[in-house]
A protein has these predicted regions:
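Histidine-centered, metal-coordinating catalytic motifs and their short helical/loop contexts
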Residues: 70-94
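Amphipathic alpha-helical interface segments
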Residues: 1-72, 101-138
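Aromatic- and Lys/Arg-enriched surface recognition patch
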Residues: 91-105
Length: 138
């Protein structure tokens, strides 16, 4: 279910990004969040947080069967941790007294680096040509 849902969300994301009117809409973030949430669930199945007993056996068997290599992007905890710790980032933004929040799709990293500054919290940014999702310092 999570793999299929991640694939559907990713297809929707690509469609929205190719549409000039939708590219900066909230819909992009809805489907990106859906994709990341489902990908995080797949990651947890493949690489449990506390791999003990049945969880460890399941993760090992699934990674072997699906030929998921060590270092695969799906095993990274960065994206799933990012989703799960939004409350901590909001607390940091408030404490720093930030005056703006950056939430945008950029065609490339140069555009992002041009507009990003210390007084803006990076809520969520997508760098389209790399398909890289950035939130705060991640």
């Amino acid at each position: 279910m999570h793999v299929s849902s991640a694939l559907v969300s990713y297809s929707q994301l690509l469609r929205l990004l190719s549409d000039g009117k939708e590219r900066q809409s909230r819909n992009v973030w809805f489907v990106l969040l859906s994709f990341l949430t489902h990908a995080a669930m797949v990651s947890k199945l493949l690489d449990p947080i506390r791999p003990e007993g049945a969880k460890e056996d399941r993760g090992t068997a699934l990674r072997k069967h699906l030929e998921v290599e060590v270092g695969s992007a799906i095993l990274s905890r960065a994206a799933r941790d990012n989703l799960e710790h939004i409350d901590e980032r909001i607390d940091r933004w408030t404490k720093r007294g930030l005056t703006s929040v950056l939430e945008m799709v950029f065609e490339d990293r140069a555009g992002f680096e041009f507009i990003a500054h210390e007084d803006a919290a990076i809520r969520r940014v997508l760098i389209q040509d790399e398909m890289i999702f950035i939130s705060e310092d991640r």
